Amino acid sequence: MALVLCALPASGMAAEGAQLVDRYCSGCHQPQAGEGSWSRISAQRKTPEGWDMTIARMGIMHGVQVPGEDRRELVKYLADSRGLAPQESAPQRALIERRLNRVESFDHPTFQQMCARCHTGGRVLLQRRTEEDWAKLVNFHVGQYQTLEFQSNARDRDWLGLALDDIVPWLGDNFSVQSDAWDSWQQATPVDPTGRFQMWGSWPGQGAFVAAVEIEAAEGDDAYRMSVDGHFLDGRELQGQGMATLFTGYEWRAQLSLDGQSLLQVLDFSQDMPSGRVFDADDEAMGMQVTLLPEAQETSIEAVLPRGLKAGERTTLAVIGTGLDADALEVGEGLEVIEVLKQENGLLLLEVAVDGSATPGWRALRQADATLERKLAVYDRVDRLEISPDFAVARVGAEQTPAVSGVFRVEGYLEGEGQQPIALGEVPVNWSVSPWDETAEQDGDVTFAGVMDKASGIFSPSGAGPNPERKYDTNNAGNLRVSATARGQSEAVSDDAQLIVTVQRWNNPPLR
């Protein structure tokens, strides 16, 4: 089950969307007073993925059959008319972007135990309902999942009583279908995503890149076509194209082909600089955060790649902004521009030499009145490393259910006495794995669970199924310590994270 991301036909307008609800849904969800109003449906608001999952559940549980094109139009109509405002979805962007290796926390003392033990709490908090409808959702869970009250964190309490008397009022107060944010967003000027942008990020195993992105309208309701033309910082080209749909006025969902690889893209277009994630639909851990800067005429400096330059070395520095001019750019003490590799309105690619005796610390970039501070630093050593995620889950795989990789990145920090740490971005490290504990060592988890790429921090799990070479013929699960050690330093600097390699997950909705 997954949200189908593609251009919608022109028939996906509001009136025709309402007609589709009447056709496929109103047999059970009765029309109510007011235009475009139905029982239960009008008591809820959700993300595009949330509405798509609802339609899928109607098919699985009630036999509702909605053809693909009509399903796409239904999702578009429901997300546009009953979606979430940007500030409502903002706390859960990580879940929408399928950044799954994270630990949730909530401002309710028992919500984790009551609701977020079978699915993420974010799946709940990306919905808005009336208090009456939240109560109906609780009752649905008890009826549909009949062992719910006998499970751990339920059998030790009056689960249903607590859910109805405590959780439902909290959800009704804090996640109501009525909100000022939604009312304001419905009155906001529609977002126009067309134009030219600079997009940048760091592709796992490939490296940092910058690319020009052209977005133009395509045939269909809020449908767009995009092209990507860029380079990795080591000079390799990056080319691609894709199709996208804009839901709820800002929720960008695209199918991309980058260098021949099929990827999905999720962006929030409500921001001045849209941002989000690009990832592999079959291996969602294999993804990258990206930011887009729209083209403009005024001078601005918004970002640099990389963020840390080592003293005594030459490197390619990407400066991203608008109205950039290499001749007018000041790069800071101890830095010398050796060659301008590329110059565009929104991008400078510079070969920069760093003096071997340059003082470690921040460097400000300046051009006329535009300044970028505390985003670029010079360092002579790395004082501290920080791996993210610090806890991750990878999954063994087979042809029918592909493996889920363990993808790690590391940031370096320069720490001066009495000063705030200076973030250096990604720095060169060597990656390795070792047993997390004595049991993992005795079971040979390092041997059987998979392989860590020393250079990239990408862990590739082993194949699924029983392994006759293991104790009890068990599968290739493991409990591993992931270590990153800074390269080229006289004193070892490292950090550790934990990686659980486990079995496949068979039910993978877009919102876990």
Short names for language-model regions:
Residues 22-32, 74, 111-123, 167:
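The canonical Cys-X-X-Cys-His
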Residues 63-95, 147-186, 190-192:
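C-terminal capping alpha-helices of c-type cytochrome domains
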Residues 119, 184-278:
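Central antiparallel beta-sheet cores of small beta-barrel/beta-sandwich binding domains
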Residues 187, 268-302, 497-506:
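Edge beta-strand at a domain terminus
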